[in-house]
């Protein structure tokens, strides 16, 4: 038998030279199939002389067709996931392996054992029939004993064998008796999964079929499926603890395996039978070269590097209808990520995933239809319910994963809000521009809220719900989430929100006018007080700032102060309020002073009517020489005109006769100097005025006497 040596490029630390079986003339053809919803998967290998046989299989099943090319060709491609190794059967009696053991048999291998209650049906690869009988108990946990493997092998021509495996014990790796085991190893992300069980060997028509039924060992490890699988060394042999010797002969020679204590035990917990144990009888057979390759329904992951040779077939990915539906859902979700509500719903959908953050499952009657984010295809069976049970060793791992998921959630929330705030900051106007619009009576035309040029800033009346949970996922989903946040979200006004108001000077203002905030808002410097503390308009300032005073006319039009001036500078509002308070205080003070002055003046007795009438009167001339330098009346502030009658008080102050008469009737003082108008003076003047009468009377008498 010819042998050749190769070195796998993908495994750096493994053996540098490995033996391989010769490749048949027609090459090897591998057909794998899977009937979804069941626990069994199958793979068949056979030498093929023509490539037309690759289409074998029953309609309605999903097949993955692989063609194993020769080793040197595969080694030239570093990116290929198919690393094929054909090791030859060694001449050594035994080859020890840590986890798996399998015996390679030739044309005449006869094995007789006590069979387990559940024995699957084996059929030809042309008909591709599947195992119909399976154990439905989902609670087989932490058992270290194994059901003896059932082997029934008939003589065939080409030395190919058929293997059936059905594993129910996830912890059977720790079997102390070294049972006959069949497993698969793959390295990815520091995870591993074990598949062990009974095997049925049958050699028919040069075909080898492997029916693998592997259950996940740990719930947290079941969700991660490797895209490349590692195949066991071809026909590795391992001694049990009490096995005597195993001899392997090549090219038609015989090898005998004698094992007195080769007892393999396994306990299967069924609903009807528990603790059933069987023993394998000794096996004597003539064996010829055989080639066994293994493909399992669930690709196992092993933590750490393995020194054994591995084969990683390039597998065409089978895309199920559920995955297509999920991808369509992602596309639809990506198209609607402008809405905050859509984003929140997407996070809620992601929260509905199972305990393992890698898997998103939709439950339906019977099985679980699951989509794996990394890798993108797999199927989880009913045994997924066992994932709720974990061992103490894996409990720490689960808690660590929970912490990592929590940390990832809070980190994602922080990134979300950071991006959300960034979008809000970018949407706000700079340099004092106001980012919301007035009601339509001010803005004129209704703005399109969906326009990218418009920005809205609202006072929320009710809080928005935070994203409840974000699953720890990788790949394109996170990219889609980041893109959706960076796009910016245009939110419309909802019920309970109060819009900020923005006044436009002209309803149909152009874009360049809208960019000048100084033209749109009243400035505090435009309002000034005159000498009498009256609010006046400085025309120069008003023209420079182009203030529209008509805005303040809307106060009485039902707009309300809060609505009409909500855009005005708060300092200006404070200034206006202070000015109003000051005006009110001035009015109050003046009224109080007037009341005090009236009281003082009332204290002085008014002048008598006789004294008032006795005041001297002077006719005002054109040159005002009669009244001196006085130009106007101090009481009425009116200028003296020609022919006005002026009255002079004893203090030599001139007044209009009507004005001073009214004043003296209220207070007997001078309105200018507050000097009392003395009644004595009035009496004296009256007496002086009355003295000429007696003088006149004698004169009159003398006149009368003269005739």
Curated annotation (Swiss-Prot):
Annotated spans, Mediates interaction with TBC1D31: 549-569
Keyword Flavoprotein carried by entry: no
Residues bearing PTM Phosphoserine: 306, 320, 339, 430
Keyword Endoplasmic reticulum: yes
UniProt biased composition (Polar residues): 74-83, 109-119, 293-308, 391-401, 482-491
Topology within the bilayer: Peripheral membrane protein
Compositional bias segments (type: Low complexity): 685-701
One CC-aspect GO term: plasma membrane
Pathway the protein takes part in: Protein modification; protein ubiquitination
Pfam families the record matches: zf-RING_2
Residues recorded as bearing Phosphothreonine in the entry: 385
Protein name: E3 ubiquitin-protein ligase Praja-2
Organism name: Mus musculus
């Amino acid at each position: 038998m010819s042998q050749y040596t190769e070195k796998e490029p993908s495994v750096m630390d493994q053996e540098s030279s490995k033996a391989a079986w010769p490749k048949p003339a027609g090459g090897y053809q591998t057909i794998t199939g899977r009937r979804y919803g069941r626990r069994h998967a199958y793979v068949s290998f056979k030498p093929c002389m023509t490539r037309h046989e690759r289409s074998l299989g029953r309609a309605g099943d999903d097949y993955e067709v692989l063609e194993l090319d020769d080793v040197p060709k595969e080694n030239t491609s570093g990116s290929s996931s198919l690393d094929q190794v054909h090791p030859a059967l060694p001449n050594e009696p035994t080859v020890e392996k840590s986890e798996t053991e399998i015996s390679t048999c030739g044309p005449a291998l006869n094995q007789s054992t006590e069979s387990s209650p559940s024995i699957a049906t084996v059929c030809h690869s042309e008909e591709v029939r599947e195992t119909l009988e399976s154990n439905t108990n989902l609670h087989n946990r932490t058992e270290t004993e194994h059901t003896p493997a059932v082997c029934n092998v008939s003589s065939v021509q080409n030395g190919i064998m058929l293997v059936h495996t059905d594993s129910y014990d996830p912890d059977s790796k720790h079997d102390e008796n070294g049972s006959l085991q069949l497993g698969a190893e793959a390295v990815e992300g520091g995870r591993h999964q074990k598949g062990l069980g009974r095997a049925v060997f049958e050699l028919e028509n040069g075909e080898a079929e492997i029916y693998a039924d592997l259950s996940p060992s740990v719930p947290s490890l079941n969700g991660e499926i490797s895209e490349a699988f590692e195949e066991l060394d071809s026909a590795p042999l391992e001694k049990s603890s009490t096995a005597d010797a195993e001899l392997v002969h090549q090219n038609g020679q015989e090898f005998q395996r004698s094992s007195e204590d080769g007892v393999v035990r396994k306990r299967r917990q069924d609903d009807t039978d528990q603790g059933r144990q069987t023993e394998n009888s000794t096996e004597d057979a003539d064996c010829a070269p055989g080639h066994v390759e293994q493909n399992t329904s669930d690709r196992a992951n092993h933590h750490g590097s393995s020194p054994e040779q591995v084969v990683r077939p390039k597998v065409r990915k089978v895309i199920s209808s559920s995955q297509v539906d999920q991808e369509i859902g992602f596309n639809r979700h990506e198209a609607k990520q402008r809405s905050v509500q859509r984003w929140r719903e997407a996070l809620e959908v992601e929260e509905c995933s199972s305990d393992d953050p890698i898997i998103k499952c939709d439950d339906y009657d019977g099985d679980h239809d699951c989509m794996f984010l990394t890798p993108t295809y797999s199927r989880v069976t009913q045994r997924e319910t066992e994932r709720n049970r974990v061992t103490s060793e894996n409990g720490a791992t689960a808690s660590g994963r929970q912490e990592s998921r929590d940390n990832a959630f809070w980190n994602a929330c922080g990134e979300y809000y950071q991006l959300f705030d960034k979008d809000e900051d970018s949407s706000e106007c700079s340099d004092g521009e106001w980012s919301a619009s007035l009601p339509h009576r001010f803005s004129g035309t209704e703005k399109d809220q969906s326009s990218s040029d418009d920005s809205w800033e609202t006072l929320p009346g009710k809080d928005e719900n935070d994203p409840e949970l974000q699953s720890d996922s990788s790949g394109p989903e996170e990219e889609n989430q980041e893109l959706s946040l960076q796009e910016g979200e245009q939110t419309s006004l909802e019920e309970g929100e109060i819009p900020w108001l923005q006044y436009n000077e002209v309803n149909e203002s152009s874009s360049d006018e809208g960019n000048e905030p100084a033209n749109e808002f009243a400035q505090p410097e435009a309002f000034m007080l005159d000498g009498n503390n009256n609010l006046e308009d400085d025309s120069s300032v008003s023209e420079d700032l182009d203030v529209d005073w008509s805005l303040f006319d809307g106060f009485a039009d039902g707009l309300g102060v809060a609505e009409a001036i909500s855009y005005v500078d708060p300092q200006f509002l404070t200034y206006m309020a202070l000015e109003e308070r000051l005006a009110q205080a001035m009015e109050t003070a003046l009224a109080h002073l007037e009341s005090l002055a009236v009281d003082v003046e009332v204290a002085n007795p008014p002048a008598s009517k006789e004294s008032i009438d006795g005041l001297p009167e002077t006719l005002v001339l054109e040159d005002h020489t009669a009244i001196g330098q006085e130009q106007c009346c101090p009481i009425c502030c009116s200028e003296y005109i020609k022919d006005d009658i002026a009255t002079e008080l004893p203090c030599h102050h001139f007044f209009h006769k009507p004005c001073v008469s009214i004043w003296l009737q209220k207070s007997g003082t001078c309105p200018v100097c507050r000097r009392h108008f003395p009644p004595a003076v009035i009496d004296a003047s009256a007496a002086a005025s009355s003295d000429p009468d007696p003088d006149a009377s004698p004169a009159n008498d003398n006149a009368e006497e003269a005739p």
